[in-house]
Amino acid sequence: MKFRSLVKATSQALTNLGYTPLFPNLDYSGENKDVALTIKEKNKLAWDHYKAVEEADAVYFILPQGYMGTSCKIELGYALALKKPIYYSEPTKDIGLDGYPKKFISLDNLIEFNDEFSRK
């Protein structure tokens, strides 16, 4: 997974705000890169992410410098098919992708999720 350390930090920040982030396989490797060595392994990791999309109330895409890789694009399509609310950390600068999020919520301003979801 690219940007693993950033995803871990974001997961912790969301937890601190009272959310339950579903970021599968964060501890699969300490490396910030794709570490699957076989197609079978890659498929297993991908399906773990699709299951998290199914279970999520909303899907937040962490997009450093607007980068969205192939796996994220597939997850985006799946989330859209499931009619999940979509959020991006920043625009991708691709109008084909930037029309989908309900809102852009920067990594520095995750508290904005409290405005999106009623906190009782």
Question: For each of these PLM feature ranges, what is it?
Answer:
Residues 1-120:
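Conserved catalytic or regulatory cores that recognize and/or transform ribose-phosphate-containing ligands
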